[in-house]
């Protein structure tokens, strides 16, 4: 029995998949907490689809996919920030514009050279088939992103809570926003290989949403979110060996399951807690 449970650890491709998935899950969850704080969840969705033309272009030119994806993600993030500052358009309009424009361009590029572009890898991911060079790319992206987040998490928290206060204590909110969107683009690049473009949004939203239901303190929310992201990603990759199912689908399914449990049973913000408060209010009347 124990030998069977430990079997995935004896295969190099599975070991790589598990630790890389955990790293990517933790980073996406770290950023997820800030997206929840600012109400920017849809920006994660826009970026996850905006990197598609970069990936398609990289495949067509024979370049590392991460290079093209990061360039496209950075361009999309910069375009959203620029339009938000200068156009006067509403945020959801800007997100929709960037999302559809970049994704449409990506699909057009795929149609130009369908044999050189792995559509399935772009849309669904394939963490079990990553090459050593891809693993190195993801490791570099992951550890650099995580290091910056650990150093700057307080500055980002202050900026996202109150930009005026951030300026008053010497921080530059615009620079920190650029840093955040750069890190978000990097995490979307990493998550693309893990779960694909269609499911990246789940990895940068669900852990933060789950943690939000469980605590009101932001440092604790960060810790819970990262733990949820790393654990569900590891378990999803691990169980995919036995179930023979899509790793990305399993990861997102576990994250959704934890969210539903928290939504129902969270001690303060859960559905059952709200029902109890409503019942007590009726009794008091």
Residue ranges of predicted features:
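Transmembrane helix-bundle core of multi-pass membrane transporters
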Residues: 2-16, 87, 91-154
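Short juxtamembrane and helix-loop transition motifs at transmembrane-helix boundaries
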Residues: 3-12, 26-37, 54-64, 156-165, ...
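Small-residue-rich segments of transmembrane alpha-helices in multi-pass membrane proteins
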Residues: 50-60, 97-109, 129-130, 173-178, ...
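Helix-loop-helix "hairpin" substructures at the membrane interface of multi-pass membrane proteins
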Residues: 135-207
């Amino acid at each position: 029995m124990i030998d069977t449970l430990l079997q995935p650890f004896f295969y190099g491709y599975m070991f790589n998949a598990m630790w890389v998935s955990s790293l990517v899950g933790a980073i996406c969850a770290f950023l997820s907490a800030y997206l929840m704080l600012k109400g920017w969840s849809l920006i994660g969705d826009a970026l996850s689809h905006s990197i598609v033309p970069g990936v398609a272009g990289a495949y067509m030119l024979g370049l590392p996919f991460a290079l093209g994806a990061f360039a496209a993600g950075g361009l999309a993030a910069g375009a959203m920030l620029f339009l938000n500052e200068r156009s006067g358009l509403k945020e959801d309009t800007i997100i929709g514009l960037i999302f559809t424009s970049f994704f449409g361009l990506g699909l057009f590029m795929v149609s130009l050279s369908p044999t050189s572009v792995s559509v399935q890898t772009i849309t669904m991911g394939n963490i079990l088939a990553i090459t050593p060079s891809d693993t190195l790319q993801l490791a570099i992206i992951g550890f650099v992103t995580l290091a910056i987040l650990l150093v700057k998490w307080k500055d980002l928290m202050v900026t996202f809570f109150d930009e005026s206060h951030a300026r008053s204590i010497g921080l530059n909110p615009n620079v920190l926003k650029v840093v955040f969107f750069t890190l978000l683009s990097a995490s979307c690049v990493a998550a693309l290989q893990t779960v694909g473009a269609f499911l990246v949004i789940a990895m940068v939203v669900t852990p933060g949403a789950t943690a939000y239901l469980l605590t009101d303190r932001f440092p604790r929310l960060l810790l819970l979110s990262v733990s949820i992201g790393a654990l569900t990603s590891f378990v999803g990759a691990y169980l995919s060996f036995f179930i023979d199912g899509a790793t990305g689908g399993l990861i997102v399914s576990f994250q959704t399951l934890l969210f539903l449990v928290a939504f129902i049973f969270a001690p303060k913000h859960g559905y059952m807690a709200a029902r109890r408060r409503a019942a007590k209010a009726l009794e008091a009347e």
